[in-house]
Design a protein with these regions (language model features):
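Sec/SRP-type N-terminal targeting helices
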Residues: 1-62
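Amphipathic alpha-helical coiled-coil/helical-bundle segments that mediate oligomerization/assembly
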Residues: 40, 78-79, 95
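Conserved catalytic core of two-component sensor histidine kinases
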Residues: 12, 82, 89
Length: 118
């Protein structure tokens, strides 16, 4: 009789522990989702800014090229314009990559990635 009560008490404790682990997992998933969602939104905004920056860097490069061909710009200044354009292209690729990583993480957490596997 004492063993039976102890077993019942232990079973209740195990049920409570399982419930707590489930709640902890749910809270952790919600926090992860919230963090990835905010990172995704930030990366989307950054991507927009980098796209604008790329347009400006491209225009700057075109102007520099015209000036270089006219002899009004040194080779070093032309290389700086080229480097600026390459840096802008690299930043936009990095922003696209980071945005996609967040998107994949959101799909994974929400279970949406399973649609891509079917």
């Amino acid at each position: 009789d004492g063993n039976r009560r102890r077993e019942q008490r232990n079973a209740r404790i195990e049920i409570d522990n399982a419930r707590l682990r489930t709640e902890q997992l749910e809270l952790s998933l919600e926090a992860d989702f919230s963090n990835f969602w905010q990172a995704y939104r930030n990366n989307v905004e950054l991507l927009k800014l980098e796209e604008e920056n790329l347009v400006a860097a491209n225009e700057n490069y075109e102007i520099a090229m015209e000036r270089y061909l006219l002899g009004d710009l040194s080779g070093i200044e032309m290389r700086e314009a080229q480097k600026s354009l390459l840096d802008a292209e690299e930043r936009i690729l990095s922003a696209q990559y980071n945005t996609k990583l967040c998107e994949i993480s959101l799909l994974q957490i929400s279970g949406g990635i399973l649609h891509y596997l079917d």
